[in-house]
Amino acid sequence: MGPLKAFLFSPFLLRSQSRGVRLVFLLLTLHLGNCVDKADDEDDEDLTVNKTWVLAPKIHEGDITQILNSLLQGYDNKLRPDIGVRPTVIETDVYVNSIGPVDPINMEYTIDIIFAQTWFDSRLKFNSTMKVLMLNSNMVGKIWIPDTFFRNSRKSDAHWITTPNRLLRIWNDGRVLYTLRLTINAECYLQLHNFPMDEHSCPLEFSSYGYPKNEIEYKWKKPSVEVADPKYWRLYQFAFVGLRNSTEITHTISGDYVIMTIFFDLSRRMGYFTIQTYIPCILTVVLSWVSFWINKDAVPARTSLGITTVLTMTTLSTIARKSLPKVSYVTAMDLFVSVCFIFVFAALMEYGTLHYFTSNQKGKTATKDRKLKNKASMTPGLHPGSTLIPMNNISVPQEDDYGYQCLEGKDCASFFCCFEDCRTGSWREGRIHIRIAKIDSYSRIFFPTAFALFNLVYWVGYLYL
């Protein structure tokens, strides 16, 4: 307006003598001023309002209601789309929120997923500038929904807080998207032969409950299933290795059904069982070997140590079985605990054998000493602690070596002779000769060596073979 005012009150117009000219210029000036003010107001509105709002038509709530009413008018939600014409194709997609915990006792696992299904329903096509209708769960029961169910589910819960966690979208071309959030307790049959070094593939199977293959076909929308960050999952004893999906057809008396399956590969973590079972068992076995270094005459000490280690192994075996179902086969942990129990029990039996023969030796030695004393009293010049051995009809005295005699009625050639003075046979000749007094010395070498070899075979066999 500044330039217009300057022009209006310029000396040129003031000197003009024509009132008509002045009036025309005045009206023109006022008209141009109004146009400029309107242009400024429109520029201010463009700064605060999205420019597309001017181009796009405004959609009112009544228009959406009218579209829904027209779609549902005459719509029968009991009939699937394209019934009698072609199968309805259901594209499925799964987003895994979390997996766990895994319950090995009941052989099941818990999974939290968002399950999505997409299909086309020509009855839901509409003409509107709005391409998609975003609806809540109230619309779900008014249109046809696939009767999908999870085949290996023991318990399934839909989430309802704060509202039902369901979503429904309808596109103008008739495409329908239906998603919902589910928490499922699914069966997972665990093969525990290698427990606790076992690996498992837990399936999640779903299919149509009533529509066979010629009515409904399931397809994966994406080649792989998306998952959330596994580090927040409550797997505890297990580690998530990966997953894979597959499609198969099962044959039943009611028809052929398409089954969609997701396999979750899990590997068990050994940390818990190493601390709770393996290390205590190994330490208990090593503790039982302390008995070999205790004097054989310390009966209470060695007996109490052996019984304590046996009872400890029994307790460890019972605790180890509590984390397992009652399977009829032997697991890797059962084998390890059983062998450890055998080693501990063998250490106790070793002292029992040693104590028995040592006591027997002392009794026979005392009897022999009495006989020698009686003979010595009858034979002049014979040392009381010696025996007579006939050589060419000559009796020669020999120091007693406190040996054992073979049991009466036994053949020394065929009996594993553990006695010092086995009279005949190859045992007496020195091929195999075991001294009872040195059983502890033999055990100090045999038990650790045998247990080390067992551990080598056990861990290599289960971890690498």
Curated annotation (Swiss-Prot):
Extracellular side: 36-273, 321-328
Sequence intervals crossing the membrane: 274-294, 301-320, 329-349, 445-465
Catalytic activities: chloride(in) = chloride(out)
GO biological process: one example: synaptic transmission, GABAergic
Topology relative to the membrane: Multi-pass membrane protein
Glycosylation-annotated residues: 50, 127, 245
Disulfide bonds: 188-202
Alphabetical list of InterPro entries matching this protein: GABAA/Glycine_rcpt, GABBAg1_rcpt, GABRG-1/4, Neur_chan_lig-bd, Neur_chan_lig-bd_sf, Neur_channel, Neuro-gated_channel_TM_sf, Neuro_actylchol_rec
Localization terms from the record: Postsynaptic cell membrane; Cell membrane
Cellular compartments per GO CC: chloride channel complex; dendrite membrane; GABA-A receptor complex; plasma membrane; postsynapse; postsynaptic membrane
Gene Ontology molecular function, alphabetical: GABA receptor binding; GABA-A receptor activity; GABA-gated chloride ion channel activity
Keyword Lipoprotein recorded: yes
Cytoplasmic compartment spans: 295-300, 350-444
Keyword hit for Ion transport: yes
Post-translational modification: May be palmitoylated.
Subunit structure, as described in the record: Heteropentamer, formed by a combination of alpha (GABRA1-6), beta (GABRB1-3), gamma (GABRG1-3), delta (GABRD), epsilon (GABRE), rho (GABRR1-3), pi (GABRP) and theta (GABRQ) chains, each subunit exhibiting distinct physiological and pharmacological properties.
Record function comment: Gamma subunit of the heteropentameric ligand-gated chloride channel gated by gamma-aminobutyric acid (GABA), a major inhibitory neurotransmitter in the brain. GABA-gated chloride channels, also named GABA(A) receptors (GABAAR), consist of five subunits arranged around a central pore and contain GABA active binding site(s) located at the alpha and beta subunit interface(s). When activated by GABA, GABAARs selectively allow the flow of chloride anions across the cell membrane down their electrochemical gradient.
Family: Belongs to the ligand-gated ion channel (TC 1.A.9) family. Gamma-aminobutyric acid receptor (TC 1.A.9.5) subfamily. GABRG1 sub-subfamily.
UniProt free text on domains: GABAARs subunits share a common topological structure: a peptide sequence made up of a long extracellular N-terminal, four transmembrane domains, intracellular or cytoplasmic domain located between the third and the fourth transmembrane domains.
The protein's name in its UniProt record: Gamma-aminobutyric acid receptor subunit gamma-1
